[in-house]
């Protein structure tokens, strides 16, 4: 169901930032910005700084509740305190998630939760020390491999939700 509600953003003085509070808005609700420019043209645009997006071909931003994640990296952070860059070799595996795992029949892509254990097993087996994920931010065109970013802080919805990404 599409409900068109229009609210005005308010500028935060001396910051270049605009803000808005919408009573009743909740996680899962979709939204876009309406931009009116000279000449009377109007554009509807997704939030480039949102945390989630609709799965393509839809293009709205989605309100995401990111508070329900329990970090489990204290051991890593403790080790990192004493790590000296340059004292150990680095081997980076650059990967595009869309070509790493074959999705189940009827799916365009595998889910982050399905991909994660397979990536970990592979990089450990091959001796890589780091992983660089290509095309992980939201982008409109599959063929771009993520080089046309439209959501800088939204992990692409092709592979699941922000909660799936944090798995």
Q: Can you name each region flagged by the protein language model?
A:
Residues 1, 67-69, 75-76, 128-135:
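Short secondary-structure boundary segments
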Residues 1-7, 31:
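Beta-strand-rich binding/interaction modules
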Residues 4-5, 39, 44, 58, ...:
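Residue-level signal for pocket-adjacent positions within structured domains
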Residues 12-94, 99-107, 114:
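The feature marks proteins involved in alpha-glucan
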Residues 79-83, 116-127:
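Short amphipathic alpha-helices and their capping/turn segments at secondary-structure boundaries
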Residues 102, 110, 121-166:
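Aromatic-lined carbohydrate-binding/catalytic grooves of carbohydrate-active enzymes
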Residues 115-116, 165:
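Amphipathic coiled-coil/heptad-repeat helices and related helical stalk/stem segments
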């Amino acid at each position: 169901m599409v409900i068109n509600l229009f609210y005005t953003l308010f500028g935060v003085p001396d910051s270049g930032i605009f803000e808005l509070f919408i009573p009743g808005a909740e996680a899962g609700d979709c939204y876009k910005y309406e931009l009116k420019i000279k000449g009377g043209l109007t554009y509807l645009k997704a939030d480039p700084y949102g945390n989630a997006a609709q799965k393509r071909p839809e293009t709205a931003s989605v309100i995401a509740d990111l508070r329900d994640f329990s970090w489990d990296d204290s051991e890593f952070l403790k080790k990192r305190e004493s790590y000296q860059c340059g004292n150990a070799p680095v081997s980076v595996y650059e990967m595009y998630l869309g070509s790493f795992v074959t999705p189940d029949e009827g799916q365009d892509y595998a889910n982050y939760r399905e991909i994660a254990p397979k990536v970990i097993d592979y990089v450990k087996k091959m001796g890589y020390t780091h992983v660089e994920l290509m095309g992980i931010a939201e982008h409109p065109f599959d063929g771009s491999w993520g080089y046309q970013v439209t959501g800088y802080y939204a992990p692409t919805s092709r592979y699941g939700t922000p909660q799936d990404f944090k798995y």
